[in-house]
Each structure stands twice: as C-alpha cells, then as structure tokens.
Amino acid sequence: MGFVKVVKNKAYFKRYQVKFRRRREGKTDYYARKRLVIQDKNKYNTPKYRMIVRVTNRDIICQIAYARIEGDMIVCAAYAHELPKYGVKVGLTNYAAAYCTGLLLARRLLNKFGLDKVYEGQVEVTGDEYNVESVDGEPGAFTCYLDAGLTRTTTGNKVFGALKGAVDGGLSIPHSTKRFPGYDSESKEFNPEVHRKHIFAQNIAEYMRLLMEEDEDAYKKQFSQYIKNGVAADQLEDIYKKAHAGIRENPVHEKKPKKEVKKKRWNRAKLSLEQKKDRVAQKKASFLRAQEKADS
C-alpha cells in the first residue's frame, strides 16, 4: 500500500480523539506505565510498587509509589537536596549523589516498616552485582520495579545509580549489570571497579586533577562550588563514605517547624461608632478654628 495523504475534512475533525493530557505534554509514557502499574490478577488488592527516579537540573527525586484510580500514592520519598545534612554539600546531581539518594530512600522505607534491622543490604560498597533475598521466618524483602519515566536508559545513566543505591540499601529490585558504568557492550563483561569509582565520585576526582594541571582558570570556573566549600579531589571518597554511614545511622526525615504567618492588612480597619463621632468632632473643631483665623 502506497503513501496515503490524510485529508483533513469535516469527518476527520469530527472523529478526531486527542491523546491523554500527560502524553500531549510529553510527561508520561503510557505504554511503559501500563506495564508498570497493572498487577497480576491473582494478587487482588496487593499494590504493585514502583521506584520512581527523576533527575532535574538541581535535584534528584526518588519515590516509592503505587497506583490507585484516584492517583498515585507516595509511600516514601528521598531527595538529593537532603544530602548536605549528611555531609555532601556539592555535586547534588552526579552519579554518586544519585546512589546516596537511592540508599537514603531504601533505608528510610525499611525504617518506616520496621525492616531496617532485617534487611541491611550491602554495607561495604563494591560496585558488584547484589540482590536482596528474603529471610526465613521474617517478612519478605520489599519488592518494587524501576520507573525511569521518559529518561533514556543508556549505560551509566544516573537513574541506575539511584537503583544501585536502593538495592544496596536493602530493596529487592529486578535488574542486571548491563546499564551500570563499567559494562562493556563489545566484550559483554562488567567491571565492578569502574562502577565503584563512579559511586565514590572518583571519575570526578580524576577530572578535577586533570583540569587543575591543564587549565586552572577552567578548573576554578567549573568547580567553583567545590572550591567555595573547601572540597578537594582527594577528599571526595571519604565524604561519600561518611555520607553512606550517616544515611544508615539516621535515615528519618526531619519535619521543619511550621512558620507562623503574620497576616497583613491592606485596607483600613472599620471605625467603631465612638471613633466615628470623635472623628467628626475633631473635624468640626478644626473647621471652626480655621474660620476664626480667617475672620481675625
């Protein structure tokens, strides 16, 4: 069949059906969402949990959610902007920060359900493949599925850094090593040492050293926030190690105290009857004084 030109006549517009709003806005991939949301028919009311990862210009958002007719229900959330509390003050959108955010989400969720002591995950970070297994006589491992949204799932993407952090934190998420940094598509081999370097930001440390030697002005421009916070290339690994330990020690979110808003009044308050009478008396007295001055 050859190419058929679409004739946009009255019948075309009469029968035209618009796509879903979030598809029109380019926010939701409904083909993927349908498969992530629909639960097995023999599991009845059991929610199908998703680990949602979104990377913005200044933040990394990680959430555990499940779908309901009225909308998605968020069970737990963690953000990269919480990392300064654990000592990571700069580079809040790199691979190492994504790993920390995923780890924070996992530890916070397990703490919420009282499973943090049962499923501790992988405490020593090696970068190698690790899968959580259910413990006999205890509740099963918390299972969820990665929701990367419209992100291109290329090898080394930050989304997989958050995934690795969550798995090392004790969540059971189906995955393989094919999308982690260190996987070679030609030889089909995975090098966990390369992955470990990315988790501890050693790829950034190497680039910092290289740029400092070659072009100091470019280094000062690109790593201005690192210089401002006194973060050197040699300190990065220790910073992230301390952050991982701090997250495991206390993953609980601290609520900020609510600020009392002082109400501002933009119009004048109504006068009482006494005030109105007094105002009239003052105006009358002022008018009479002015008259007397004019006469004299």
Swiss-Prot record:
Compositional bias of type Basic and acidic residues: which residue ranges?
A: 271-281
Q: Which CDD domains match?
A: Ribosomal_L18_L5e (cd00432)
Which ranges are annotated Basic residues under compositional bias?
A: 255-268
The UniProt keywords, alphabetically, are: Cytoplasm, Nucleus, Ribonucleoprotein, Ribosomal protein, RNA-binding, rRNA-binding
- GO MF annotation list: 5S rRNA binding; structural constituent of ribosome
A single GO CC term for this protein reads: cytosolic large ribosomal subunit
Instruction: Name the protein family.
Output: Belongs to the universal ribosomal protein uL18 family.
Q: What is this protein called?
A: Large ribosomal subunit protein uL18B
